[in-house]
Design a protein with these regions (language model features):
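Alpha-helical transmembrane bundles and membrane-interface segments of multipass inner-membrane proteins
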Residues: 1-190
Length: 190
C-alpha cells in the first residue's frame, strides 16, 4: 500500500471520530472545537495524499476510488450533522447529494463508453470552498464565538454568517455540477 493511500485511509478513519466528537458536542460544547480539529486534519489529508501520489508516482486505482469517496463522505457527514443541529438547511444538503450522484452517474456512463472524466478545476474548487466553509462554520458556531459575536456584534450574526457559507457552498456545487455536464454532454448522446 502506498503512502498516499495510507493517508487517505487516515481520512476515512477520522470520519467516525469526527461524528463521535460532533455528537459529544451536544453535551460538551468544547467538543465542537475538537470536531473542528478532526475535520481540519481530515481535510488537510486530502491535499497531502494527492500531492504525494503525484510527486512520487503513487497514483493507484484504489487511491482514485478511495480519495474522492472519502472526501464526499467527510463533507456529507459534516453537513448532515449541521442539518441535525438546524444550522445547515436540508435543501442545501440535497443540492450537494444530487450533484455528487449526478456526476458519479455521468462518470459511470463515460466509463461504459471507454472514456474517463477527469476531475475539473471547478470540482476541486467546490471541494476547497466546501471544506473551508465547513471549517469556518465549526469554528464560529462553537459556544465561545457564537455567544461573543451574537452578543457584542449583532444578534443575528451567526444566522447571516451561516447562510453566507451555505450559499457559497450551494452556488459552487451547482456551478461545478453544471460544468461537468456541459463539458461532457456528448457522453449522454447515443
Amino acid at each position: 500500500m502506498t503512502t498516499a493511500t495510507k493517508i487517505t485511509f487516515i481520512r476515512v478513519f477520522l470520519i467516525p471520530v469526527f461524528l463521535v466528537c460532533m455528537y459529544l458536542a451536544e453535551q460538551y460544547p468544547f467538543m465542537l472545537y475538537v470536531s473542528l480539529a478532526v475535520f481540519a486534519i481530515a481535510s488537510l489529508t486530502d491535499l497531502i495524499d494527492g500531492k504525494i501520489a503525484r510527486k512520487y508516482h503513487q497514483v493507484t486505482d484504489l487511491g482514485k476510488f478511495l480519495d474522492p469517496l472519502a472526501d464526499k463522505v467527510l463533507v456529507i457527514a459534516a453537513m448532515a450533522m449541521f442539518c441535525e443541529r438546524g444550522i445547515f438547511p436540508a435543501w442545501a444538503l440535497m443540492i450537494v447529494l444530487t450533484r455528487e450522484f449526478a456526476v458519479t452517474g455521468l462518470r459511470l456512463i463515460a466509463v461504459g463508453k471507454g472514456r474517463v472524466i477527469a476531475a475539473a478545476w471547478s470540482g476541486k474548487m467546490k471541494t476547497a470552498v466546501t471544506m473551508a466553509g465547513l471549517c469556518l462554520m465549526l469554528f464560529f458556531n462553537g459556544e465561545f464565538f457564537a455567544n461573543l459575536l451574537n452578543t457584542h456584534i449583532c444578534p443575528c450574526f451567526m444566522t447571516v454568517f451561516n447562510w453566507v457559507i451555505v450559499g457559497a457552498i450551494a452556488l459552487v456545487t451547482l456551478y461545478s455540477g453544471i460544468e461537468y455536464f456541459v463539458k461532457n454532454r456528448d457522453v449522454l448522446g447515443k
